[in-house]
């Protein structure tokens, strides 16, 4: 088992990474008599709800659960209200701990519920997808979607512990594994060139779910993100760098309808658009753009804009991005592999050219 600590100004919390942790009571920061509500979904519940419940019962916790529908399209105020209703019906108070058992959607919705219920209760992240293990479970971003934009309603709210059991990836559909690798590749591209080179050597092992490489990879991603979050918890500076490809990607998700493309798939295509724009600005060599493209392709991820979405469709969605300031786009771009920066006033015509460069032509 590995442990990565997230060091915040006022406190710290651990991220435990290893095999079989769902049944390891020592990683749960709970004691006998504690009240716990598990938030999960209809896909994860048959796989892991009983296992986690049994572990909590062994500790002596009072355990209940709430079951949400599975998928990005259920990352809504309706799902949030479903959690609140369950908490209220069972008379849960401020001493309750909420546990998010599932992927990024469950973590985001449950985290926002924990941030909001009675002005804040404790919560634990147990991410079961690769994307949530390397990214969304770490750092305290919680949110639900609005029909006009992704993650528009939310809060920064940190868990007290993150428990990453890598054996949960064995039940993950291949498409979901690949989607998680988009965020993995992102880390190397923005902040860690040696890690990018490691990925070029090991990406096939990650696709094949090699446990040794997976645990190394997840821990490294968590360390990168933990370091960034420690410096900038509420995304007023460096933390924005973690959003490579996300402004383009969120436009894809919103335009197509949540869930048609997985988040990681949209991030992969969006990262290629960011790389293409970086090249057009004279920052990134064409050979490096090709390396990024090859790595995404080896992870079976899209590198082009989806069919049915025109380049002109992007900008209206992108102008609603949370990083927009004074009506101007702020985009995460690359100076070089492993060196990202925030471009504060990019010519929209150049942005459109980059999108065209990543659009399939007949």
From Swiss-Prot:
Signal peptide stretch: none
Reaction equations catalysed: 7-phospho-2-dehydro-3-deoxy-D-arabino-heptonate = 3-dehydroquinate + phosphate
Stated name of the protein: 3-dehydroquinate synthase
Matching Gene3D superfamilies: 3.40.50.1970, Dehydroquinate synthase-like - alpha domain (1.20.1090.10)
Organism: Actinobacillus succinogenes (strain ATCC 55618 / DSM 22257 / CCUG 43843 / 130Z)
Residue numbers binding NAD(+): 70-75, 104-108, 128-129, 141, 150, 168-171
Pathway(s) where this gene product acts: Metabolic intermediate biosynthesis; chorismate biosynthesis; chorismate from D-erythrose 4-phosphate and phosphoenolpyruvate: step 2/7
Superkingdom of the source species: Bacteria
PANTHER family in alphabetical order: 3-DEHYDROQUINATE SYNTHASE (PTHR43622), 3-DEHYDROQUINATE SYNTHASE, CHLOROPLASTIC (PTHR43622:SF7)
HAMAP family the UniProt entry points to: DHQ_synthase
């Amino acid at each position: 088992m590995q442990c990565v600590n997230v060091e915040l100004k006022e406190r710290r919390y651990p991220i435990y990474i290893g095999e079989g942790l769902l049944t390891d009571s020592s990683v749960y920061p709970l004691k006998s008599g504690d009240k716990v509500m598990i938030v999960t979904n209809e896909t994860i519940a048959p796989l892991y709800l009983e296992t986690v419940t049994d572990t909590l019962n062994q500790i002596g916790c009072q355990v209940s659960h709430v079951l949400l529908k599975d998928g990005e399209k259920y990352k809504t105020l309706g799902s949030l209200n479903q959690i609140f209703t369950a908490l209220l019906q069972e008379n849960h108070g401020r001493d309750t701990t909420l546990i998010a058992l599932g992927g990024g959607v469950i973590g985001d919705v449950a985290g926002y519920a924990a941030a909001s219920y009675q002005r804040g209760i404790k919560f634990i992240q147990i991410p079961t997808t690769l994307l949530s293990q390397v990214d969304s479970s770490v750092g305290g971003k919680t949110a639900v979607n609005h029909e006009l934009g992704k993650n528009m309603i939310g809060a920064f709210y940190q868990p007290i512990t993150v428990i990453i059991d890598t054996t949960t990836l064995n039940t993950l559909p291949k498409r979901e594994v690949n989607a998680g690798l988009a965020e993995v590749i992102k880390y190397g591209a923005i902040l860690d060139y040696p890690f990018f080179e490691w990925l070029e050597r090991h990406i096939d092992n990650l696709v094949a779910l090699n446990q040794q490489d997976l645990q190394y990879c997840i821990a490294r991603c968590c360390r990168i993100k933990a370091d960034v979050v420690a410096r900038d918890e509420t995304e007023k500076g460096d933390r924005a760098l973690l959003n490579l490809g996300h402004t383009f990607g969120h436009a894809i998700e919103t335009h197509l309808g949540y869930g048609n493309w997985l988040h990681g798939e949209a991030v992969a295509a969006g990262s290629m658009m960011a790389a293409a724009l970086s090249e057009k600005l004279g920052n990134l060599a064409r050979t490096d753009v090709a390396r990024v493209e090859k790595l995404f392709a080896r992870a079976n991820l899209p590198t082009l804009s989806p069919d049915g979405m025109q380049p002109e469709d992007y900008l209206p969605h992108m102008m609603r991005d949370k990083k927009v300031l004074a009506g101007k786009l702020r985009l995460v771009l690359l100076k070089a592999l492993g060196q990202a920066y925030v471009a504060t006033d990019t010519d929209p015509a150049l942005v459109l050219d980059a999108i065209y460069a990543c659009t399939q032509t007949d």
